[in-house]
A protein has these predicted regions:
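Structured-RNA-binding interfaces characteristic of tRNA pseudouridine synthases
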Residues: 63, 75-325
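Short hydrophobic targeting helices and cationic amphipathic motifs
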Residues: 43, 47, 51-53, 60
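Residue-identity detector for glycine
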Residues: 22-23, 28-32, 49, 58
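Ala/Thr-enriched low-complexity intrinsically disordered regions
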Residues: 17-19, 27, 41
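Cationic, low-complexity basic patches in intrinsically disordered or flexible, solvent-exposed regions
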Residues: 26, 35-38, 45, 57, ...
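Short, positively charged and aromatic/hydrophobic N-terminal segments
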Residues: 2, 19, 54, 59, ...
Length: 325
């Protein structure tokens, strides 16, 4: 991909054995009688070999006599944009989610922190960082996926090292790879998986309290599993979301798995995509059923708008586990 905003025009007068073009490295043309067309072909072939740029040549004037050949031309230089995919692990406790849109846009988001470091690393402005799944306030990620375009020639290893050196300690880049230009972290995702972690004990763990939801009694796992079946498949999740202005609120839930014992429990939910707060509201509803605050029949009533959804689950126990492509 070429970034037309960063193209530069050069106007060059060239004679038989040049040393530099615009201060760049020697192209290596040797003496001898060559036509302007052959010289042009040589320049294209050799400059593109030595520099991470793509040249576009236009001959303005040329002449050839016994003693010398001269070629006056202009070329346009495009910086080649690379597409970089990164995998990110983060503790979302102190952030306002992956990103915030509109008037409430905040710098205290995961994406803002990464974009700030990317700008310093590349010297580029207005970097667009696409993510696989926008996590909400306080939600964590084991493997968020994002991509961005850059003309930097840093290796993927150097990019990873730079980001991990300058990002906050609660954000880590676990993998960096160069991908085809058409890859888009959000548009190419085929499924997204969240996992909700809970502990069940009389005294909450001091070390787990910020990253798991604590229950003082064990929810009815069997009742939750039966209720979870009502979410499987394609439904209009408008009433299980806070995204009231979304035009398309139909999503397909592939799987909900509830497992664990009397001390720890996890809820895994996989779907093609999630509306804003959809995962939290589904999990919150299942917990209400597990604690006897609702019946599974309420799920159908909420879908139909006959009843209102309850409170979303506490975000501190929710993790984006995987984005599949």
């Amino acid at each position: 991909m070429y970034n037309s905003e960063n193209c530069i025009f050069y106007y060059i007068s060239w004679e038989m054995t040049p040393t530099f073009i615009g201060g760049k490295k020697q192209a290596g043309i040797s003496g001898g009688s060559q036509s302007p067309q052959l010289m042009e072909a040589f320049l294209k072939r050799n400059l593109n070999r030595h520099f991470y740029y793509m040249m576009e040549f236009v001959i303005l004037k040329s002449y050839n006599d016994r003693d010398k050949i001269s070629l006056q031309f202009k070329y346009r230089e495009y910086k080649i944009m690379r597409n970089i995919k990164i995998t990110i692990e983060y503790d979302g406790s102190r952030y306002q989610g992956w990103t915030r849109l509109g008037k409430d846009e905040s710098n205290n988001t995961i994406s803002a922190k990464i974009i700030d470091v990317l700008g310093k690393m590349t010297g580029e402005k207005n970097i667009e960082l696409n993510c696989g799944c926008r996590t909400e306030v306080g939600v964590h990620a084991y493997a968020q996926v994002a991509n961005f375009k850059t003309s930097s020639n840093l290796s993927t290893k150097d990019i990873q090292h730079y980001l991990n050196r300058y990002l906050p300690m609660d954000i880590a880049i676990t993998e960096v790879e160069e991908v085809p230009d058409r890859f888009h972290a959000q548009l190419n995702a085929v499924s997204k998986t969240y996992v909700y972690r809970m502990t069940i004990m009389d005294v909450p763990s001091v070390f787990e309290r910020k990253h798991t939801y604590h229950c003082f009694k064990t929810p009815d796992k069997k009742a939750m599993q039966q209720a979870a079946l009502l979410f499987i498949g394609e439904h209009d999740f408008r009433n299980f979301s806070t995204a009231k202005k979304s035009k398309n609120t139909t999503r397909e839930v592939y799987d909900i798995d509830i497992y664990g014992d009397n001390e720890e429990m996890q809820i895994l939910i996989q779907a093609d995509d999630f509306l804003h707060n959809m995962a939290r509201l589904i999990i919150g509803t299942l917990l209400d059923i597990g604690f006897g605050l609702r019946k599974k029949e309420d799920i159908e009533a909420i879908f139909n708008g006959e009843k209102t959804v309850g409170n979303p689950c506490d975000p501190k126990g929710l993790y984006l586990q995987e984005v599949e492509y």
